Regions:
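Conserved alpha-helix/loop element of class I SAM-dependent methyltransferases that forms part
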Residues: 76-93
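A short acidic, Gly/Pro-enriched loop at the edge of an enzyme's catalytic core
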Residues: 153-165
């Protein structure tokens, strides 16, 4: 099954423009409810500066509504495709993998299908999203994956439990990066890696984010930007791979960032 076919199971589609979304909506979606129209008209978004409750309300609303789910997630199709390609290339050899902020499970289930020899745990703080993820797990007959409702700062697994931790634009919404990275460091094995792909497009914010990773005791072993296209617009996603071990060769963070922004 291709990535595009897989995401269609979650009503996530590859649109090239907002006009394509609008035309598809009129032809395929039922009439929105009053609450859905209010949500769409206000164009509410999850925001790193918002509190836990506000972001929970946002993702719960998306998790409850098929229309909102399809619209909001389809807008970022390109990011999901580029991120998944990068993550799958990085997961080879790891047996126990944690996916943080799994939403309705569209990426976690794809990883589990592509790497059946590994076991996956997907966590999200939205009950509605996790419920949908578990339903899709059953539909796909996946036995190497579990979805649970959990805050990323309260993951109650034994120390050094996971070989790999994957984050696709979720830690970015944490109110306290250092607290989150310190917590994740405890549950990552000595030889494991943390892959984080934050939704950050500003030079200084990327540097601040990486500084907090390093302050938590991680070393950066790979850092690069991957190109993606969302609704016809080109973007570059920072991909940061971290380890608890010192790298053989230090990554020049400023050089990588300046190469893109200058």
């Amino acid at each position: 099954m291709s990535f595009e076919e897989h995401l269609k199971l979650f009503n996530i589609f590859h649109f090239k423009s907002f006009d394509e979304i609008e035309n598809f909506a009129y032809s395929n979606w039922p009439k929105p409810t009053r609450d859905e129209l209010k949500f769409l008209n206000q164009r509410e978004k999850a925001d790193p500066s918002s509190g836990f409750i506000d972001n929970l309300k946002f993702y719960s609303a998306v998790g409850k509504s098929e229309i909102l789910q399809s619209l909001i997630l389809s807008e970022r199709y390109g990011s999901y495709e580029s991120s998944s390609n990068f993550v799958i290339e990085s997961l080879n050899g790891f047996k126990t993998i944690l996916d943080i902020g799994c939403s309705i499970g569209y990426l976690t289930t794809y990883y589990a299908l592509k790497i059946p020899e590994s076991s996956f745990i997907g966590i999200d703080f939205s009950f509605e999203s996790v419920k949908k993820a578990n339903n899709m797990k059953k539909k796909l007959n996946l036995n190497n994956i579990d979805f649970i409702v959990r805050d990323m700062n309260k993951i109650n697994y034994p120390n050094k439990y996971f070989d790999c931790i994957v984050d696709t634009q979720s830690i970015y919404y944490s109110k306290d990066y250092l607290k989150t990275f310190n917590h994740l460091r405890k549950i990552l094995s000595d030889n494991g890696i943390l892959i984080t792909i934050p939704g950050i497009g500003e030079k200084d914010l990327i540097k601040q984010y990486i500084n907090q990773i390093q302050n938590a005791g991680f070393s950066i072993i790979n850092f690069k930007f991957i190109e993606t296209i969302n609704l016809g617009e080109k973007e570059y996603l920072p991909t940061i791979t971290c380890s608890l071990k010192k790298p053989k060769e230090k990554i020049n963070i400023d050089h990588v960032i300046n190469k893109l922004f200058n």
